[in-house]
From Swiss-Prot:
GO terms for cellular component: cell outer membrane. It comes from the Bacteria. Transmembrane segments: none annotated. This is Uncharacterized protein YfeN. InterPro entries: Channel_Tsx-like (IPR018013), Channel_Tsx-like_sf (IPR036777). Belongs to the nucleoside-specific channel-forming outer membrane porin (Tsx) (TC 1.B.10) family. The lineage of its organism: Bacteria, Pseudomonadati, Pseudomonadota, Gammaproteobacteria, Enterobacterales.
């Protein structure tokens, strides 16, 4: 763990001279209310292990573009209306994600840094799952669209396993379009994990896994966005089968 934290720290230090001369290009921030509805098959098959029950959550989300690169992050408060130590699946949980792309000049390539964590304490038994990615990315962008793939090494710090944990190849993508006078955005994030450590793989469906979501957003006004997402995961999230859900969302944009 120390080696990987040192790598991330050095990367941040090297970026400081660039950040100190950064020009802010734009950004966004929002607060949203979301409800994740797992398919009945997913809930039934996960009832003895990962307990995937439907849940609502509050999310704070934001991103910013600079001359040196870009940042994105969110913080989710899941089952905020329940107790911290409720039974598994209905307990409060806390999840965050942060991604950074540090541009490598004008090449289109970027240094990709990614941190993710989720935490809970069902029945007063603490659980955590942290993931750190460091690798290389590339930005493809055009008028109203973007496709940003990455390839990264992964380190996991989890309740049941800590150590190097293979690789992740993935992307974020989006497309803005109009239907009549209404503004819409179609987005997708996707992560393919492979060459996982054998210990981790034993509890997560094997050496490979898939995780992601496809979303359609209606930008109703400058301050209100609603959306519907199809959430999917295969050999991931503590299970060895395909899991899916629909997420209903409404966000207030600052």
């Amino acid at each position: 763990m120390k080696k990987h934290l040192l790598t991330l720290t050095l990367s941040s230090i090297l970026a400081i001279p660039v950040v100190s001369h950064a020009e802010f290009k734009g950004g966004f921030a929002d607060i949203g209310v979301h409800y994740l509805d797992w398919t009945s098959r997913t809930t039934e098959k996960s009832s003895t292990k990962s307990h995937k029950d439907d849940f609502g959550y509050l999310e704070f989300e934001g991103g910013a573009n600079f001359s040196w690169g870009e940042m994105y992050g969110f913080f989710d408060w899941e089952n905020f209306y329940n107790g911290r130590h409720n039974k598994p699946g209905s307990e409060q949980r806390y999840t965050f994600k942060n991604t950074n792309r540090i541009y490598l000049g004008d090449t289109g390539f970027n240094l990709y840094l990614h941190a993710y964590g989720t935490y809970g304490s069902a029945n007063r038994v603490n659980f955590h799952d942290d993931m750190f990615l460091y690798g290389i990315g590339y930005n493809f962008t055009g008028s109203g669209w973007w496709f940003k793939p990455f390839f990264a090494k992964r380190y996991t710090d989890q309740t049941y396993y800590t150590g190097d944990n293979g690789y992740v190849a993935g992307w974020v993508a989006g497309y803005n379009f109009m239907l009549g006078s209404e503004k819409f955005t179609l987005t997708n994030w996707n992560e393919y994990e492979f060459d996982r450590d054998a210990t981790y793989a034993a509890g997560n469906g094997g050496k490979e896994g898939l995780n992601g979501a496809v979303a359609l957003w209606w930008n109703a006004t400058s301050h209100i966005t609603t959306g519907i997402q199809y959430r999917y995961a295969d050999d991931k999230l503590g299970e060895d089968f395909y899991q899916d859900a629909i997420i209903y969302s409404i966000k207030f944009n600052f």
